[in-house]
Amino acid sequence: MRCPSLARLPHRALSGLTKSPVRLQSQNFLYQRCASTAALRSPIAGPAYQSVFNRHNLQRRNASAATAAAVLEAAASNPDGLSQEAIIDNLDPAEAIRLSRLRNIGIAAHIDSGKTTCTERVLFYTGRIKAIHEVRGRDNVGAKMDSMDLEREKGITIQSAATFCDWVKKGDDGKEEKYHINLIDTPGHIDFTIEVERALRVLDGAVMILCAVSGVQSQTITVDRQMRRYNVPRISFVNKMDRMGANPFKAVEQINTKLKIPAAAVQVPIGAEDEFEGVVDLIRMKSLYNEGPSGENIVIKDEIPEKVKSVVEERRRMLIETLADVDDEIAELFLEETEPTEQQLKAAIRRATIGLKFTPVFMGSALANKSVQPMLDGVIDYLPNPSEVENLALDRKRDEASVKLVPYNSQPFVGLAFKLEESNFGQLTYIRVYQGTLRKGANVFNARNNKKVKVPRIVRMHSNEMEEVSEIGAGEICAVFGVDCASGDTFTDGQLGYTMTSMFVPEPVISLSIKPKNNKDSANFSKAMARFQREDPTFRVSYNAESEETLISGMGELHLDIYIERMRREYRVDCVTGPPQVAYRETIGNRVEFDHLLKKQSGGPGEYARVVGWMEPTGKLEDNKFEEQIVGGSISEKFLFACEKGFNLACEKGPLIGHKVLGTRMVINDGATHMTDSSEMSFKNATQQAFRKAFMESNPSVLEPMMKIVVTAPGEFQGDVISLLNKRNATINDTETGVDEFTVYADCSLNGMFGFSTHLRAATQGKGEFTMEFSHYEKAQPQLQKELIQKYLKAQADRHKK
């Protein structure tokens, strides 16, 4: 769980917390120097100084250990009182340097905005790869981060891929500093949104990429929502500046208006489209150009081209004004009409970005190898290191009280498994280490089941390649083999009873019946299903006893198609699938009172349970609610627990069409028991029967999932696209017309969208694209409801005939 605000908490004096051991460290160097030269001055001086050095070194280690222990105690007992400043101040100096040079970032955006292309340049410029390969490139190699054959064939990212690299940042004084970056490239398609979700859950910052032509798109809004959910600071990069119709300032404006986050350009492009040459840095007021066969050399010039001078002055003024709205120091300078220095601007942008108040906007073209390196400098300058981000856990030993995680290597280990993958060597588990050190061969405990497991191997991942390491420190991301767990599990070294909140997992909206073509493939079919469920929390497998079918459920048609194709390729299992099935829901119509008696007394143990109360809508189509308002103890506590269980079971399969129930409240306020014949089973069954009867009397409704649809296509096809949507009874909410394309925003039932992609391709000569995301549930049309009920009743009747 990440703290809602990354702004520093007020620093309070904490008992037992010593000052930073930085001074001890500097004295340590002095003692070491004296010890090394003492033998030149006196035969006995060397051993004497060495003795002092050893004693002082022990004091330093003891001081660091005492400080770490005090910080750990403060993190548990008074997390609000322990500021990030105090945590950083009391870091071991070597650890402070390591963490300050570390960034954990993700790259996220709408589909086809250039995420993977941009990541490929980052890896090349940092020296991680020796050559650039394009997504769907002609060399049949493909981008490094698209390691699956399916990804390279389709030209889309399906799974998030992790890598690491080192970036050497050059200062204005020519001094070079090396930074370590853990980077995760995420998919852009909405069907694979869980990959973005779990990446952002463990990252400290992100680069949000936008298309210079399209600006903020539908999946950009989804990614923004996910970043806000986990309080992830971001910088923005307007890509594809070399494309026809590129308008980066439209993208900046849309970040402000559509995403509702203050944003300002920190660069101005020199030219655009096929005349895009480079950028002007608005903070340093210098021009930046890329040279070399792959743009690997950055050339900095003091001269700003005449053609962009007026735009540069205007955009710098807008940058300062926007910062003045979100940062007190710049606001003071602005009111005093004092021009801020480069250092003041950088510090303000960093504070505002980490505080989730602002996003700086960079510009470039990854495909044209232009202005990617300045964006990397922005990652270092403006995104937080692990010690600057507040992460919270829950202490199960203290009624799940919040505790702060401290990124010290000397603390007890706490880590989160955020992604599972099957490899040739077994299950690969990705872990973010929040506190302590994870060592090869160490025993760790799964907080979910208290199971102890040994860590046989630790690796750093570079897409589908790996590099073995012996240990990983706080703030790092790694992968381990041989650890059986589920996505979202917390691991500790056994000293602490901490658990971390898992990521948000959306409910599936579409299902298919599936079975292997040949019965001999059943074993591999079952293996594949088990593996895919472990890896992807949004992929669900269930068995329908009535139809005797296996059902797979997911986020969309593409999502399920990918898994069916993976089963064929990776497990050599060809499958037969049924038509798509919509995840309908049922809900109560109006308030209904009930007084139900279950009585079976025919010799021997009988059944007796009476439940009295009412059922009504909750007001919102959300979770169901059960309440008891018993006065006088007419139903005992254990029987009321059985009533609640019966209610929950009844909600799993509604009486109308056999789908889950939403937005229904059940209240039991009276009842009766029998001395010998009442049991928990009796009250569970009585509640289910009362539920079914009252539900059917309430004028219930079938609910169908409504989807947010965004269609983008060339302008000449606008009429055809609108016609396609109208045929599906879609509600068109808005349209946007660009230079050569248009975008339609609409709501439509999922049932009406089956086969839409095929019809869209035909209507737009293959040039149209669309995204679809679950929005809400809505009452189905009366005719559809009637058809669904008849179909369900027929299936029930056919089943009883068997």
From Swiss-Prot:
Q: Where in the cell is it found?
A: Mitochondrion
Which keywords does this Swiss-Prot/TrEMBL entry list?
Answer: Elongation factor, GTP-binding, Mitochondrion, Nucleotide-binding, Protein biosynthesis, Transit peptide
Name the CDD domains for this protein: EF-G, EFG_III, EFG_mtEFG1_IV, mtEFG1_II_like
Domain tr-type G stretches:
100-387
One of the record's GO cellular component terms:
mitochondrion
- GO BP, one annotated term: mitochondrial translational elongation
- UniProt KW Aminoacyl-tRNA synthetase keyword: no
The pathway entry for this protein reads as: Protein biosynthesis; polypeptide chain elongation
Output the Gene Ontology terms for molecular function.
Answer: GTP binding; GTPase activity; translation elongation factor activity
Fill in the transit peptide range: 1-24
One matching Pfam family, short form?
Answer: GTP_EFTU
InterPro entries listed in its UniProt record: EFG_II, EFG_III, EFG_III/V, EFG_IV, EFG_V-like, EFTu-like_2, G_TR_CS, P-loop_NTPase
Where along this sequence does the record place binding of GTP?
Answer: 109-116, 185-189, 239-242
Record family assignment? Belongs to the TRAFAC class translation factor GTPase superfamily. Classic translation factor GTPase family. EF-G/EF-2 subfamily.
Q: Do you know which PANTHER family this protein is assigned to? A: ELONGATION FACTOR G, MITOCHONDRIAL
**What does the UniProt function comment say about this protein?**
Mitochondrial GTPase that catalyzes the GTP-dependent ribosomal translocation step during translation elongation. During this step, the ribosome changes from the pre-translocational (PRE) to the post-translocational (POST) state as the newly formed A-site-bound peptidyl-tRNA and P-site-bound deacylated tRNA move to the P and E sites, respectively. Catalyzes the coordinated movement of the two tRNA molecules, the mRNA and conformational changes in the ribosome.
Q: Which HAMAP family does the protein's record reference?
A: EF_G_EF_2_B
- Spell out the protein name for this chain: Elongation factor G, mitochondrial
> What is the species of this protein?
Neosartorya fischeri (strain ATCC 1020 / DSM 3700 / CBS 544.65 / FGSC A1164 / JCM 1740 / NRRL 181 / WB 181)
Lineage, please?
Answer: Eukaryota, Fungi, Dikarya, Ascomycota, Pezizomycotina
